[in-house]
Amino acid sequence: MAHPEQQYLDLLAQTLERGDRRVDRTGVGTLSLFGAMLRFDLSDGQVPILTTKRVYWKTAVKEMLWFLTGGTNIRPLLQENVRIWSDWPLAAYRRESGEEISQAAFEQRILEDEAFAARWGELGPVYGRQWRRWLGPDGREHDQIAALIETLRTNPSSRRMLFHAWNVAEVGQMALPPCHMVYQYHVTSDGRLNALLYQRSVDLLLGAPFNFVGAAALQLMIAQQAGLVPGDLVWVGGDTHLYLNHLDQAREQTGRAPRDWPRMRLLRQADGIDDYRIEDFAVEGYDPHPAIAAEVAV
């Protein structure tokens, strides 16, 4: 049987070989394929933390936990040493202030100055806001995550068990419109929780590996809260692309052989979806190839 990571390596290779060369929003340019699907079996505890390069899984899980708080400001992320969202507010600050501040100096100001963080660390109504506090036309806020878990507990055969972040009325206010847009869930007759994640836009080298980990961690948490066990994680990509400054790195990664996937487990039964912490996650048997450095396109 082929290693499950081979699906991802094959997608990298296909994008390198057949990707449509496009000029994109960032100005970097991409090789793009439209429509991709990967399927990962989480039932034995294995999770899609890539082994052909080191993936900083704790960073991905911390980001997912931040989403679940409903957060929209980078300050709590920086307090957890997570810097993956800094580029967008930094670019906005440089553009609006004219100050050529370094990323390190900008992040330090966010950490030390609450007023500065409130003004310049804000990302707008991004993922967490939509997941936990979607604003309806009547002014009421809707908690999609709480509603999902309640439905999983009370009506697990429902075909309406999903949440998403593409709020048309607020997309223009977001620092970055949602890439991993829709999460849908399905319960089998033997109590397995399957998940499907749809991404409209996929940075295949840098973004997708984090999205795999975040979605798997979320599936473990939701399964525990609903009294289920994890099943399949199905990942679907829309515009699936490699940035032109990532091609050498992608070629390097496709030349590496996958190693055994690690296992992820929760160390305790949390009282609710809001009670999980990074310390609740254990990853065992992770032995990856070295990290592959690449620049984020903003």
From Swiss-Prot:
Does the keyword field hold Protease? Answer: no
According to the record's subunit comment, the protein's assembly and interactions are: Homodimer.
- Which residues take part in binding (6R)-5,10-methylene-5,6,7,8-tetrahydrofolate? 203, 297
EC code(s) of this entry? 2.1.1.45
Classification via HAMAP family: Thymidy_synth_bact
Would you say which domain of life the source belongs to? Answer: Bacteria
Organism classification:
Bacteria, Pseudomonadati, Pseudomonadota, Alphaproteobacteria, Rhodobacterales
Q: Where in the cell is the protein located?
A: Cytoplasm
Q: Which residues form the active site?
A: 179 (nucleophile)
Q: Which GO terms describe its biological process?
A: dTMP biosynthetic process; dTTP biosynthetic process; methylation
Question: Known Pfam families for this protein?
Answer: Thymidylat_synt (PF00303)
Q: Which UniProt keywords apply?
A: Cytoplasm, Methyltransferase, Nucleotide biosynthesis, Transferase
Q: Which GO terms describe its molecular function?
A: thymidylate synthase activity
Q: What does this protein do?
A: Catalyzes the reductive methylation of 2'-deoxyuridine-5'-monophosphate (dUMP) to 2'-deoxythymidine-5'-monophosphate (dTMP) while utilizing 5,10-methylenetetrahydrofolate (mTHF) as the methyl donor and reductant in the reaction, yielding dihydrofolate (DHF) as a by-product. This enzymatic reaction provides an intracellular de novo source of dTMP, an essential precursor for DNA biosynthesis.
UniProt-recorded name of the protein: Thymidylate synthase
Q: Which CDD domains match?
A: TS_Pyrimidine_HMase
